[in-house]
Structures are given as C-alpha cells and as structure tokens.
Amino acid sequence: MMAATAAAQVRAGTRWAPALCRMPWLPLMLVAAAAATSEQQVPLVLWSSDRGLWAPAADTHEGHITSDMQLSTYLDPALELGPRNVLLFLQDKLSIEDFTAYGGVFGNKQDSAFSNLENALDLAPSSLVLPAVDWYAISTLTTYLQEKLGASPLHVDLATLQELKLNASIPALLLIRLPYTASSGLMAPKEVLMGNDEVIGQVLSTLKSEDIPYTAALTAVRPSRVARDVAMVTGGLGRQLLQRTVVPPTMNVPVSYNDSYDTRILFWAQNFSVAYGEHWEDLTSRTFGVQDLNLTGSFWNDTVARLVLTYDSLFGTMVTFKFILANSYYSVSARHWFTLENLEIHSNGSVAYFNASQVTGPSIYSFHCEHVSSENEDGNLLVPDTQPSLWQMTFRDFQIQAFNVTDKKFSYASDCAGFFSPGIWMGLLTSLFMLFIFTYGLHMILSLKTMDRFDDHKGPTITLTQIV
C-alpha cells in the first residue's frame, strides 16, 4: 500500500515538472508578489510613562519608510532605559489613512475613533509616531522585543490582565490582539476602530490604577488600504510637506586671549593639523572650545601681539606654537597694517620658524583665508626657514585678529583670495575678445565708401583695337 502511494507521488511529480516548465511566467509572478509584499507599510505608535526616551524622528517626512535597522535605533533606548513592562497592541489591519479618516484631525474630538489613544499620547511623557514602517520590520517586532526583554510574549485580554500581577523590575511582554473589519463581520471600520480604542483605554486604565510603568506600541500585521506608489519618493526624494528641523553645522569656538581689560586676540580655524615627519595630528578638538587651553606666554600691546598655544603631550613631548604679529603704520595708505611675521614651533629645545608675511591686512580688519598651509598644493603661505622641514602645518578656514577687537567678535575679514583668480581671468579675456570683434566690425562699417563716378552710357564708347 505504501509502495503504491509512493509510486503515485513519483508519477505525480513527473507530471508536475513539465507543467512548471510550461509556465515560465510563474517565477516572475512570485518575484512581483514578493516585491509587492516588501512595499507594504503600516504605522507604528509608541508611547511610554517615562520621559526622554525618544528624540524627534529625523526622517519621518512624506515618503520615508522606516526600515528594521532604523526601527531598532528607536526601540533600543526605550527597552534599555525605559520601563520593563511592554505592551504590544497588534491589529489585523491598520494604515495611516485610518487616522486621517476616522480621527479628530479637524478639531472634532467627539467624533474621533481614537479618543483614548489621543489622550494617552497627550499625557505620555514620551511618544513617537512613525507613519510608515516596513512590513518586514513589523513581522519581526515580536521576536525582537522578546530577545531584548528576555521574556516570552504573553497573549492577554482585559480579563487576563486584571488577574496578572505585574512587577516594575521584572520584564514582561504583553501581546493584545485587536480585530479589524476582516474579522468583524458587517461592522463598519469606524465602529471596529472605536471598539479597539476602548480596549486600549481599559488596558491603560488598569495599569494606571496599579501604578505600573509601561511602554506601549500600536501597530498592525498589514495595511488596511492599498498604498500608492512611493518608489520615487523613498529615501528623502519626495516633497516634504512638513517643515523639517535643520541641524546647524557645528562651529568651533574661537581661541581668545584676554588681558586684564578686554579681549585682545582672536584665532579660529575649521581645522588645525600639524605633522612631524610623516605623522599628522588633528589639534582642532584640543584647541577650539577648550576651557583649560594653555595660553601661557601670550602677550599684547598696540604694536606687537603674541599668541602662544602649548600642548603637553604632542608627538610624545611638549610642543608650543607662537603666532607673532606686528602692527605698523604705512604713510602710503595712511593706515595701520598688521602682519603675521613668524609662526614658531618650539619642541625639545629646538625651534622651527615659518615665514607668514603674506598673512596681512588693515589692522581694523581680521584676516581670513581658505587654506593657510606649508604645503605647496594649499598655497604655501607658511614658508619654512629650512628646507626640507620636519614640521608641516595646515589651517582650513583660517581667521585671526590681534588688533582692534571689539565686542569679542571678529571684524570684517580681509580675505586672501587674489583679484585675478582663474574665473576672473576667463571673464576678462572673453570680454576683451568680444570687444575686439565689436571694434573690428565697427571699423569695417565706418570704412565703407560709396562710388563717386559712374559709367555714362550716352558718351562715346571705348574702342579697343585688336592687334594680331
């Protein structure tokens, strides 16, 4: 009997194989179905009785889909620092459009199908709403919570919850299933959502009466509505209808030397790097914004200023940088000009000198340059006295002012950019070429002359005798 059954199965398999070969479109259908499944998104609403668990989501604008990796970055702070009791309200179907269609989005709170949920979000110290979460991330959410909490999910209803004795120090994962229209017969979607909202309200009231801290999440297994095609707007390419918070770039705080009266010297750079031999060190974080920066030896008066920066452990020894500036009056321009005469590096009793006389400007201004470096490819504004030098220095967005500092701010900057830059030369040459063409054409027009003599056909004709 078993042999006959096996033989029948083998014969059936031989019949199915040619049939599958006659359907080459079947793999394409499977791939399309898998792609459609991967594009399904559902909302995720998180709230907790503890505060400060979530920062505002940076990419929850229109079209962004939260992946499983991004979701873990949102959940980890709540699971590691928040309450140990986690509630997961899981519906069969839910879409972000349900909140728009049945929620009190226009101020009509009495007609909202999510009154208890809205009240919980308003009162929660921490909350986070993710409009679109990838279906795969939601499908593995229960397993992820179980691994992070170290507790098996417990399927409960309202009656079971009232009998449970939860402890704030013992982790617990409570799973509450909520129905939707697919399992509610002839009930309208709004009525089902209102019933689910009542269940959420009763569960939260039970926890509140027992004074149990918790973290809750509301999501669904699959979306209730067919999502429109967002393939062209994922990853931040879509129109962002809501204003996004723009994080300003971090700016280094300038180094300031103050005497007993006021701020005298200001020094700033976006990047400050120094090299000894082939080894480079970035001193930006050790220089700007440092409260205990060693400025011992700095000096200032009306004609000479010296800014001294000392680092205790740089390349295994103490290294000191000295910026020496001079302020002089020039009768030709009838104003004072400052010059960074030298930049000195003191280390192990030796001194390396760099000529920086190109760092100059009117003393009422500061000096700014995109690159101030001892390397040739960056302009070579710092020229070492000895070649080759073991020391190399590079400043990016360099700015310094040692005279006429007011209100602890840089004055107007005299930039190192030359007037005859490549772009300016291109514009000048093009303009001169077009001017030459215009001048040549005008000269040709002015040189045109009309004939003042014409052939008179009434006069005697000219006869040419042919000589053979």
Curated annotation (Swiss-Prot):
Which residues make up the pro-peptide?
A: 36-228
Share the record's PTM remark: N-glycosylated.
Q: Which residues lie on this side of the membrane: Cytoplasmic?
A: 439-468
Tell me, in one coarse class, where this protein mainly resides.
Answer: endoplasmic reticulum
Provide the Gene Ontology terms for cellular component. Answer: clathrin-coated vesicle membrane; endoplasmic reticulum membrane; endoplasmic reticulum-Golgi intermediate compartment membrane; proton-transporting V-type ATPase complex; synaptic vesicle membrane
Cystine pairs: C369-C416
Which InterPro entries does this chain map to? Ac45_acc_su, VAS1/VOA1_TM, VAS1_LD
Keywords associated with the record: Cytoplasmic vesicle, Disulfide bond, Endoplasmic reticulum, Glycoprotein, Hydrogen ion transport, Ion transport, Membrane, Signal, Synapse, Transmembrane, Transmembrane helix, Transport
Q: Which Pfam families match?
A: Ac45-VOA1_TM, VAS1_LD
Tell me, what is an example of a GO biological process annotation in this record? intracellular iron ion homeostasis
Subcellular location per UniProt equals:
Endoplasmic reticulum membrane; Endoplasmic reticulum-Golgi intermediate compartment membrane; Cytoplasmic vesicle, Secretory vesicle, Synaptic vesicle membrane; Cytoplasmic vesicle, Clathrin-coated vesicle membrane
Q: Where is the signal peptide?
A: 1-35
Task: Note the topology in the membrane.
Answer: Single-pass type I membrane protein
Q: Which residues lie on this side of the membrane: Lumenal?
A: 36-417
Q: Where is this chain glycosylated?
A: N167, N258, N271, N294, N301, N348, N355, N404
| Marked site positions, Cleavage | R228, D229
Molecular function GO labels: ATPase activator activity
Where is the chain membrane-spanning?
418-438
* Summary of the function given for this chain in its UniProt record: Accessory subunit of the proton-transporting vacuolar (V)-ATPase protein pump, which is required for luminal acidification of secretory vesicles. Guides the V-type ATPase into specialized subcellular compartments, such as neuroendocrine regulated secretory vesicles or the ruffled border of the osteoclast, thereby regulating its activity. Involved in membrane trafficking and Ca(2+)-dependent membrane fusion. May play a role in the assembly of the V-type ATPase complex.
What protein family is recorded?
A: Belongs to the vacuolar ATPase subunit S1 family.
Question: Subunit structure of this entry?
Answer: Accessory component of the multisubunit proton-transporting vacuolar (V)-ATPase protein pump. Interacts (via N-terminus) with ATP6AP2 (via N-terminus). Interacts with RNASEK. Interacts with TMEM106B (via C-terminus).
Q: What is this protein called?
A: V-type proton ATPase subunit S1
Originating organism: Bos taurus
Organism lineage: Eukaryota, Metazoa, Chordata, Craniata, Vertebrata
